[in-house]
């Protein structure tokens, strides 16, 4: 029996019934969240003497989850002013907030630790604003290392035809020729992020080796930095969440420890999101209708792409289970679809489940990351509720 309630059908159904939850809804397992954050922190500390995890709040910005990140000594990785506000509301120390891109003035006013800047023009703007406010601002330059993350092309971020980052040769030339003219910024490090949902650790090995070369070139030009931010990207097992509820953080950090030469000299940063929260959440939905079209069995549920857009957007595949005790020996292959007026509103095709009837509940697993945060009100849908168990 699995120790986590979201993977125990009986206990999950009891919780839903006892609290009269209205579907669709998200349910998060607090014990799994705590265990995952603790595991990540222990693995980090075992592998490095001077490193920090910044929780990538874009994965799930629920205040309770941000509070758990703070509890385990993690900083927050933000990409908007709203995310900075959420972190500050949860009393996260601004010196443990890193920020990429927008709402620059808000970040400067709150004295965040550093910007992760991904264009040279952005650095000019930051310097101008900092000069006007008479402040010094820390910046890590986001490098595009031209590394294939071997992931879906929508979430690849580290190749030259991706929109993110600056080619290292341009960074080196700028540091040598232009940096001296920017009086209100301090370049303290390099920032990388090659993609998301990365399962092949060879990608992280390549990133570590590439970063070694970049540091070597900087030092050959008498340019010294103190921080390296490797970003995130560590994936989760969407096919077997019950068997693999917590990712191999030890293997992830050990790969950087083994192949990055400067671990003992520099402060290292990691921006983890999906790997910390993805497996902790389940989207619960109710069967609205069954229908058969020329032999194809459809089950229409009350959750749609407005609640979980990943299948429609990324062709993502989530494990789905029927929370029922009857008909478990009677199987049927279904197209599992939502009620939204879009042909892409499909969770799975030819997916085998026990025979379903109106009112049965389904659990869509691995929905703790990029689920509720990507929800929309398209078709004037009400906001999906979240619960912690």
UniProtKB/Swiss-Prot annotation:
Keywords: Amino-acid biosynthesis, Decarboxylase, Lyase, Lysine biosynthesis, Pyridoxal phosphate. The keyword Lyase applies. It catalyses: meso-2,6-diaminopimelate + H(+) = L-lysine + CO2. InterPro entries: Ala_racemase/Decarboxylase_C, DAP_deCOOHase_LysA, De-COase2_C, De-COase2_N, De-COase2_pyr-phos_BS, Orn/DAP/Arg_de-COase, PLP-binding_barrel. GO terms for molecular function: diaminopimelate decarboxylase activity; pyridoxal phosphate binding. Pyridoxal 5'-phosphate binds at residues 233, 271-274, 370. Pfam families: Orn_Arg_deC_N, Orn_DAP_Arg_deC. One of its GO terms (biological process) is lysine biosynthetic process via diaminopimelate. Substrate binds at residues 274, 310, 314, 342, 370. Belongs to the Orn/Lys/Arg decarboxylase class-II family. LysA subfamily. Homodimer. This is Diaminopimelate decarboxylase. It comes from Francisella tularensis subsp. holarctica (strain LVS). The lineage of its organism: Bacteria, Pseudomonadati, Pseudomonadota, Gammaproteobacteria, Thiotrichales. The gene is lysA.
């Amino acid at each position: 029996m699995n120790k986590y309630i979201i993977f125990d059908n009986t206990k999950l159904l009891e919780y839903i019934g006892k609290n009269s939850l209205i579907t669709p809804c998200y349910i998060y397992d607090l014990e799994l969240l705590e265990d995952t954050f603790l595991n990540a922190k222990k693995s980090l500390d075992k592998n490095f003497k001077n490193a920090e995890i910044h929780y990538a709040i874009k994965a799930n910005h629920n205040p309770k989850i941000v509070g758990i990140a703070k509890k385990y000594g993690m900083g927050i990785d933000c990409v908007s002013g709203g995310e900075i506000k959420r972190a500050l509301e949860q009393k996260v120390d601004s010196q443990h907030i890193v920020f990429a891109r927008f709402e620059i003035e808000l970040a400067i006013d709150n004295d965040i630790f550093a910007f992760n800047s991904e264009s040279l023009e952005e650095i000019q703007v930051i310097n101008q604003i900092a000069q006007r406010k008479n402040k010094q601002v820390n910046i890590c330059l986001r490098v595009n290392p031209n590394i294939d993350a071997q992931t879906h092309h929508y979430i690849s971020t580290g190749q030259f035809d991706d929109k993110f980052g600056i080619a290292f040769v341009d960074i080196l030339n700028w540091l040598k020729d232009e940096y001296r003219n920017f009086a209100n910024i301090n370049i303290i490090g390099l920032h990388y992020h090659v993609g998301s949902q990365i399962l092949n650790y060879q990608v992280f090995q390549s990133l570590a080796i590439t970063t070694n070369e970049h540091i070597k070139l900087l030092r050959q030009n008498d340019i010294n930095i103190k921080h390296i931010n490797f970003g995130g990207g560590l994936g989760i097992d969407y096919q077997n969440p019950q068997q693999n509820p917590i990712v191999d953080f030890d293997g992830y950090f050990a790969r950087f420890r083994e192949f990055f030469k400067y671990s003992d000299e520099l402060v290292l940063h990691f921006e983890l999101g999906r790997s910390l929260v993805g497996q902790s959440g389940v989207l619960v939905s109710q069967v609205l209708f069954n229908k058969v079209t020329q032999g194809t069995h459809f089950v229409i549920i009350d959750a749609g792409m407005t609640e979980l857009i990943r299948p429609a957007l990324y062709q993502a595949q989530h494990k789905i289970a029927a929370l029922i005790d009857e008909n478990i020996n009677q199987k049927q292959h279904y197209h599992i679809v939502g009620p939204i007026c879009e042909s892409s509103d499909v969770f799975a095709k030819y997916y085998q489940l026990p025979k379903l009837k109106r009112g049965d509940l389904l659990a869509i697993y691995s929905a703790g990351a990029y689920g509720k945060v990507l929800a929309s009100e398209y078709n004037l849908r009400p906001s999906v509720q979240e619960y912690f168990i």
